[in-house]
Protein backbone atom coordinates (compact mmCIF):
# COMPACT_ATOMS: atom_id res chain seq x y z
CA UNK A 1 0.00 0.00 0.00
CA UNK A 2 2.71 2.50 0.94
CA UNK A 3 4.74 1.67 -2.16
CA UNK A 4 1.69 2.10 -4.38
CA UNK A 5 1.06 5.53 -2.85
CA UNK A 6 4.59 6.45 -3.95
CA UNK A 7 4.09 4.88 -7.43
CA UNK A 8 6.79 2.31 -6.76
CA UNK A 9 6.64 -1.19 -8.29
CA UNK A 10 4.54 -3.70 -6.30
CA UNK A 11 4.02 -7.46 -6.50
CA UNK A 12 0.25 -6.94 -6.78
CA UNK A 13 -2.32 -4.16 -6.59
CA UNK A 14 -3.18 -3.23 -2.98
CA UNK A 15 -6.85 -3.16 -2.03
CA UNK A 16 -8.98 -1.64 0.71
CA UNK A 17 -12.57 -0.37 0.67
CA UNK A 18 -14.26 2.78 1.84
CA UNK A 19 -16.81 1.82 4.54
CA UNK A 20 -15.14 -1.58 4.79
CA UNK A 21 -16.37 -1.70 8.39
CA UNK A 22 -20.07 -1.07 7.89
CA UNK A 23 -23.64 -2.26 8.03
CA UNK A 24 -23.13 -5.06 5.50
CA UNK A 25 -21.09 -6.96 8.13
CA UNK A 26 -23.07 -8.98 10.71
CA UNK A 27 -20.34 -8.35 13.30
CA UNK A 28 -20.74 -4.60 12.86
CA UNK A 29 -24.53 -4.79 13.12
CA UNK A 30 -24.21 -6.70 16.40
CA UNK A 31 -22.02 -3.93 17.83
CA UNK A 32 -24.46 -1.26 16.63
CA UNK A 33 -27.34 -3.01 18.38
CA UNK A 34 -25.60 -2.09 21.64
CA UNK A 35 -24.27 1.42 20.92
CA UNK A 36 -25.18 4.41 18.77
CA UNK A 37 -23.00 5.55 15.90
CA UNK A 38 -21.32 8.49 17.64
CA UNK A 39 -20.99 6.50 20.86
CA UNK A 40 -19.04 3.94 18.83
CA UNK A 41 -16.88 6.63 17.20
CA UNK A 42 -16.03 8.10 20.60
CA UNK A 43 -15.12 4.75 22.18
CA UNK A 44 -11.51 4.20 21.02
CA UNK A 45 -11.20 0.57 22.06
CA UNK A 46 -14.52 -0.41 20.46
CA UNK A 47 -13.90 1.64 17.29
CA UNK A 48 -10.48 0.03 16.90
CA UNK A 49 -11.91 -3.43 17.59
CA UNK A 50 -14.49 -2.98 14.80
CA UNK A 51 -11.82 -2.07 12.25
CA UNK A 52 -9.32 -4.70 13.40
CA UNK A 53 -11.97 -7.41 13.08
CA UNK A 54 -12.84 -6.13 9.61
CA UNK A 55 -9.22 -6.16 8.43
CA UNK A 56 -8.81 -9.69 9.75
CA UNK A 57 -12.00 -10.93 8.11
CA UNK A 58 -11.49 -9.29 4.71
CA UNK A 59 -7.71 -9.42 4.33
CA UNK A 60 -7.46 -5.84 3.06
CA UNK A 61 -4.16 -3.97 2.76
CA UNK A 62 -5.04 -0.88 4.83
CA UNK A 63 -7.15 0.05 7.85
CA UNK A 64 -8.99 3.35 7.70
CA UNK A 65 -9.92 4.47 11.20
CA UNK A 66 -13.53 4.06 12.27
CA UNK A 67 -14.78 7.62 12.59
CA UNK A 68 -16.86 10.22 10.74
CA UNK A 69 -16.28 13.44 8.82
CA UNK A 70 -18.23 15.72 11.13
CA UNK A 71 -16.98 15.50 14.76
CA UNK A 72 -14.37 18.16 13.90
CA UNK A 73 -17.26 20.65 13.74
CA UNK A 74 -18.34 20.18 17.38
CA UNK A 75 -15.36 21.97 19.01
CA UNK A 76 -15.80 24.68 16.38
CA UNK A 77 -19.25 25.49 17.77
CA UNK A 78 -21.59 23.45 15.57
CA UNK A 79 -24.50 21.73 17.35
CA UNK A 80 -24.23 18.31 15.73
CA UNK A 81 -26.61 15.40 16.19
CA UNK A 82 -26.81 12.03 14.46
CA UNK A 83 -30.46 10.97 14.21
CA UNK A 84 -31.72 7.52 13.25
CA UNK A 85 -32.94 7.47 9.66
CA UNK A 86 -32.04 11.10 9.05
CA UNK A 87 -28.26 11.14 9.39
CA UNK A 88 -26.28 14.13 10.65
CA UNK A 89 -28.18 17.28 11.58
CA UNK A 90 -26.63 20.63 12.52
CA UNK A 91 -29.09 22.61 14.60
CA UNK A 92 -27.34 26.00 14.27
CA UNK A 93 -26.51 26.29 10.55
CA UNK A 94 -24.50 29.17 9.11
CA UNK A 95 -26.77 30.87 6.57
CA UNK A 96 -25.59 34.50 6.50
CA UNK A 97 -22.25 36.29 6.46
CA UNK A 98 -22.63 37.29 10.11
CA UNK A 99 -23.14 33.65 11.10
CA UNK A 100 -19.63 32.73 9.96
CA UNK A 101 -18.22 34.54 12.99
CA UNK A 102 -19.83 31.84 15.15
CA UNK A 103 -17.48 29.20 13.75
CA UNK A 104 -14.61 29.02 16.23
CA UNK A 105 -10.99 28.47 15.26
CA UNK A 106 -9.77 24.99 16.13
CA UNK A 107 -6.71 25.96 18.14
CA UNK A 108 -6.40 22.77 20.17
CA UNK A 109 -7.72 19.31 19.53
CA UNK A 110 -8.47 18.24 23.09
CA UNK A 111 -12.14 17.62 22.26
CA UNK A 112 -11.04 15.37 19.40
CA UNK A 113 -8.55 13.35 21.45
CA UNK A 114 -10.78 10.29 21.07
CA UNK A 115 -9.96 10.27 17.33
CA UNK A 116 -6.22 10.19 18.05
CA UNK A 117 -6.87 7.41 20.57
CA UNK A 118 -8.68 5.46 17.83
CA UNK A 119 -5.64 5.92 15.58
CA UNK A 120 -3.29 4.67 18.32
CA UNK A 121 -5.47 1.70 19.26
CA UNK A 122 -5.90 0.68 15.62
CA UNK A 123 -2.18 0.99 14.94
CA UNK A 124 -1.33 -1.05 18.04
CA UNK A 125 -3.55 -3.93 16.95
CA UNK A 126 -2.27 -4.29 13.39
CA UNK A 127 0.64 -6.02 11.75
CA UNK A 128 3.30 -3.50 10.72
CA UNK A 129 2.62 -4.29 7.06
CA UNK A 130 -0.91 -2.82 7.25
CA UNK A 131 -0.93 1.00 7.27
CA UNK A 132 -3.50 3.01 9.19
CA UNK A 133 -5.37 5.66 7.20
CA UNK A 134 -6.64 8.74 9.02
CA UNK A 135 -9.10 11.06 7.35
CA UNK A 136 -11.02 14.31 7.38
CA UNK A 137 -13.77 16.01 5.45
CA UNK A 138 -12.59 18.61 2.95
CA UNK A 139 -13.36 22.28 3.62
CA UNK A 140 -16.10 22.45 0.97
CA UNK A 141 -17.93 19.39 2.24
CA UNK A 142 -17.69 20.58 5.85
CA UNK A 143 -18.86 24.07 4.82
CA UNK A 144 -21.83 22.54 3.01
CA UNK A 145 -22.89 20.66 6.13
CA UNK A 146 -22.47 23.82 8.23
CA UNK A 147 -24.60 25.88 5.84
CA UNK A 148 -27.26 23.34 4.83
CA UNK A 149 -27.66 21.94 8.34
CA UNK A 150 -27.28 18.41 6.98
CA UNK A 151 -27.03 16.64 3.66
CA UNK A 152 -28.65 18.16 0.58
CA UNK A 153 -29.56 17.36 -3.02
CA UNK A 154 -29.15 20.86 -4.47
CA UNK A 155 -26.83 22.68 -2.03
CA UNK A 156 -28.74 25.90 -2.68
CA UNK A 157 -27.94 27.55 0.66
CA UNK A 158 -24.26 26.73 0.15
CA UNK A 159 -24.15 28.13 -3.37
CA UNK A 160 -26.07 31.27 -2.46
CA UNK A 161 -23.66 32.14 0.35
CA UNK A 162 -20.74 31.34 -1.96
CA UNK A 163 -22.04 33.55 -4.79
CA UNK A 164 -23.58 36.41 -2.80
CA UNK A 165 -21.19 36.69 0.13
CA UNK A 166 -17.81 35.79 -1.33
CA UNK A 167 -15.76 37.41 1.42
CA UNK A 168 -17.69 35.54 4.12
CA UNK A 169 -17.38 32.34 2.08
CA UNK A 170 -13.60 32.56 1.93
CA UNK A 171 -13.48 33.40 5.65
CA UNK A 172 -15.49 30.25 6.39
CA UNK A 173 -13.34 28.11 4.11
CA UNK A 174 -10.13 29.55 5.58
CA UNK A 175 -11.23 28.59 9.09
CA UNK A 176 -12.17 25.09 8.01
CA UNK A 177 -8.98 24.59 5.98
CA UNK A 178 -6.80 25.52 8.95
CA UNK A 179 -8.79 23.19 11.20
CA UNK A 180 -8.57 20.28 8.76
CA UNK A 181 -4.83 20.81 8.35
CA UNK A 182 -4.27 20.59 12.12
CA UNK A 183 -6.57 17.59 12.38
CA UNK A 184 -4.80 15.60 9.65
CA UNK A 185 -1.37 16.34 11.10
CA UNK A 186 -2.56 15.28 14.57
CA UNK A 187 -3.69 11.94 13.16
CA UNK A 188 -0.28 11.44 11.55
CA UNK A 189 1.39 12.31 14.84
CA UNK A 190 -0.82 9.69 16.54
CA UNK A 191 0.39 6.94 14.20
CA UNK A 192 -1.52 7.14 10.91
CA UNK A 193 0.76 6.57 7.93
CA UNK A 194 -1.65 7.86 5.27
CA UNK A 195 -4.50 10.37 5.41
CA UNK A 196 -7.47 10.81 3.08
CA UNK A 197 -9.37 14.02 2.40
CA UNK A 198 -13.01 13.33 1.53
CA UNK A 199 -14.74 15.99 -0.59
CA UNK A 200 -18.03 14.14 -0.79
CA UNK A 201 -20.08 17.06 -2.13
CA UNK A 202 -17.61 18.83 -4.44
CA UNK A 203 -19.20 17.15 -7.46
CA UNK A 204 -22.11 19.60 -7.26
CA UNK A 205 -19.77 22.31 -8.59
CA UNK A 206 -18.56 23.07 -12.08
CA UNK A 207 -14.83 23.44 -12.77
CA UNK A 208 -14.69 27.24 -12.64
CA UNK A 209 -16.57 27.43 -9.34
CA UNK A 210 -14.32 24.73 -7.90
CA UNK A 211 -11.23 26.60 -9.05
CA UNK A 212 -12.38 29.92 -7.59
CA UNK A 213 -14.16 28.94 -4.39
CA UNK A 214 -12.66 25.61 -3.31
CA UNK A 215 -9.26 24.74 -4.74
CA UNK A 216 -7.09 27.16 -2.68
CA UNK A 217 -8.69 25.98 0.56
CA UNK A 218 -8.32 22.28 -0.22
CA UNK A 219 -4.68 22.97 -1.01
CA UNK A 220 -4.23 24.62 2.41
CA UNK A 221 -5.96 21.71 4.15
CA UNK A 222 -3.56 19.15 2.64
CA UNK A 223 -0.30 21.08 2.44
CA UNK A 224 1.27 20.27 5.82
CA UNK A 225 0.15 16.64 5.88
CA UNK A 226 1.52 16.20 2.33
CA UNK A 227 4.97 17.13 3.57
CA UNK A 228 4.84 14.23 6.04
CA UNK A 229 2.93 11.36 4.42
CA UNK A 230 0.88 10.26 1.41
CA UNK A 231 -2.43 12.11 1.11
CA UNK A 232 -5.35 10.61 -0.80
CA UNK A 233 -7.61 13.33 -2.25
CA UNK A 234 -11.06 11.97 -3.03
CA UNK A 235 -14.11 13.69 -4.46
CA UNK A 236 -17.14 12.19 -6.11
CA UNK A 237 -19.80 13.14 -8.63
CA UNK A 238 -18.01 15.12 -11.34
CA UNK A 239 -15.08 13.66 -13.33
CA UNK A 240 -14.43 17.04 -14.98
CA UNK A 241 -12.95 18.17 -11.65
CA UNK A 242 -10.17 15.57 -11.66
CA UNK A 243 -7.39 17.79 -13.09
CA UNK A 244 -8.29 20.46 -10.52
CA UNK A 245 -8.25 17.93 -7.67
CA UNK A 246 -4.71 17.03 -8.68
CA UNK A 247 -3.82 20.72 -8.86
CA UNK A 248 -5.16 21.21 -5.32
CA UNK A 249 -2.94 18.43 -4.01
CA UNK A 250 -2.66 14.82 -2.98
CA UNK A 251 -0.13 12.18 -3.93
CA UNK A 252 -3.06 9.84 -4.63
CA UNK A 253 -6.27 10.96 -6.36
CA UNK A 254 -9.42 8.99 -5.57
CA UNK A 255 -11.64 8.19 -8.56
CA UNK A 256 -15.36 7.41 -8.51
CA UNK A 257 -17.05 5.08 -11.02
CA UNK A 258 -18.38 7.79 -13.36
CA UNK A 259 -15.26 7.67 -15.53
CA UNK A 260 -13.05 4.82 -16.70
CA UNK A 261 -9.94 4.48 -14.57
CA UNK A 262 -7.59 4.81 -17.54
CA UNK A 263 -9.22 8.06 -18.67
CA UNK A 264 -9.17 9.37 -15.12
CA UNK A 265 -5.46 8.65 -14.70
CA UNK A 266 -4.67 10.46 -17.94
CA UNK A 267 -6.71 13.46 -16.72
CA UNK A 268 -5.01 13.47 -13.32
CA UNK A 269 -1.52 12.97 -14.68
CA UNK A 270 0.82 10.01 -14.37
CA UNK A 271 2.84 11.81 -11.70
CA UNK A 272 0.06 10.82 -9.25
CA UNK A 273 -1.14 7.50 -7.95
CA UNK A 274 -4.86 6.78 -8.29
CA UNK A 275 -7.38 4.94 -6.14
CA UNK A 276 -10.57 3.31 -7.33
CA UNK A 277 -12.92 2.80 -8.93
CA UNK A 278 -15.45 -0.07 -9.01
CA UNK A 279 -19.11 0.98 -8.75
CA UNK A 280 -20.29 -0.17 -5.28
CA UNK A 281 -23.53 -1.40 -6.87
CA UNK A 282 -21.55 -4.14 -8.65
CA UNK A 283 -21.13 -5.79 -5.25
CA UNK A 284 -24.90 -6.29 -5.10
CA UNK A 285 -24.81 -8.64 -8.11
CA UNK A 286 -23.17 -12.08 -8.15
CA UNK A 287 -19.65 -13.39 -7.72
CA UNK A 288 -19.01 -13.94 -11.43
CA UNK A 289 -20.00 -10.34 -12.21
CA UNK A 290 -17.89 -9.04 -9.34
CA UNK A 291 -14.89 -10.98 -10.61
CA UNK A 292 -15.35 -9.82 -14.22
CA UNK A 293 -15.86 -6.16 -13.35
CA UNK A 294 -12.90 -6.21 -10.95
CA UNK A 295 -10.66 -7.54 -13.72
CA UNK A 296 -11.92 -4.75 -16.00
CA UNK A 297 -10.80 -2.08 -13.53
CA UNK A 298 -7.43 -3.77 -13.07
CA UNK A 299 -6.98 -3.91 -16.85
CA UNK A 300 -7.63 -0.17 -17.14
CA UNK A 301 -4.70 0.47 -14.79
CA UNK A 302 -2.55 -1.25 -17.44
CA UNK A 303 0.00 -2.47 -14.90
CA UNK A 304 1.19 1.08 -14.24
CA UNK A 305 2.68 1.51 -10.73
CA UNK A 306 0.49 3.55 -8.41
CA UNK A 307 -2.95 1.93 -8.60
CA UNK A 308 -4.78 1.24 -5.33
CA UNK A 309 -7.95 -0.78 -5.81
CA UNK A 310 -11.04 0.58 -4.09
CA UNK A 311 -14.66 1.28 -4.80
CA UNK A 312 -15.81 4.56 -6.27
CA UNK A 313 -17.65 5.19 -2.98
CA UNK A 314 -18.42 3.28 0.21
CA UNK A 315 -19.68 -0.31 0.51
CA UNK A 316 -23.49 -0.26 0.38
CA UNK A 317 -25.41 -1.58 3.42
CA UNK A 318 -27.05 -4.60 1.72
CA UNK A 319 -23.87 -5.86 0.07
CA UNK A 320 -23.34 -9.64 0.46
CA UNK A 321 -20.14 -10.28 2.39
CA UNK A 322 -19.18 -13.09 0.00
CA UNK A 323 -19.08 -10.59 -2.87
CA UNK A 324 -16.70 -8.34 -0.95
CA UNK A 325 -14.48 -11.35 -0.28
CA UNK A 326 -14.64 -12.27 -3.98
CA UNK A 327 -13.50 -8.77 -4.97
CA UNK A 328 -10.53 -8.88 -2.60
CA UNK A 329 -9.53 -12.39 -3.66
CA UNK A 330 -9.70 -11.33 -7.32
CA UNK A 331 -7.46 -8.31 -6.77
CA UNK A 332 -5.00 -10.48 -4.86
CA UNK A 333 -5.03 -13.11 -7.60
CA UNK A 334 -6.27 -15.84 -5.25
What are these regions (language model features)?
Residues 1-78, 82-84, 291, 299, ...:
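N-terminal basic, low-complexity leaders that serve as flexible interaction/assembly modules and, when applicable
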Residues 29-41, 97-108, 246:
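Short, basic, glycine/proline-bearing loop/turn elements
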Residues 34, 86-101, 155-156:
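Active-site gating loops and adjacent loop-to-helix segments of metal-dependent hydrolytic enzymes
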Residues 44-45, 109-112, 170:
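Generic detection of long, well-ordered alpha-helical segments
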Residues 62-84, 94-95, 99-108, 192-210, ...:
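Glycine-rich, proline-tolerant flexible connector loops at the mouths of alpha/beta enzymes
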Amino acid sequence: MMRACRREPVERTPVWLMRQAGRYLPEYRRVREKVGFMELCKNPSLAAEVMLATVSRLGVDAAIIFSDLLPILEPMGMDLEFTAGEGPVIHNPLREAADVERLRELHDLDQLSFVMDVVRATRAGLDDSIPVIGFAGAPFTLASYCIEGGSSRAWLHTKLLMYRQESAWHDLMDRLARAVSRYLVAQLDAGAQIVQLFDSWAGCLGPEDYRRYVLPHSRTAMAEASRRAPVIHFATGNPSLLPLLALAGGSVIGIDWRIELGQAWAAVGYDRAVQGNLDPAVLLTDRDTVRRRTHEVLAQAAGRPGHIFNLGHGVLPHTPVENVLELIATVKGD
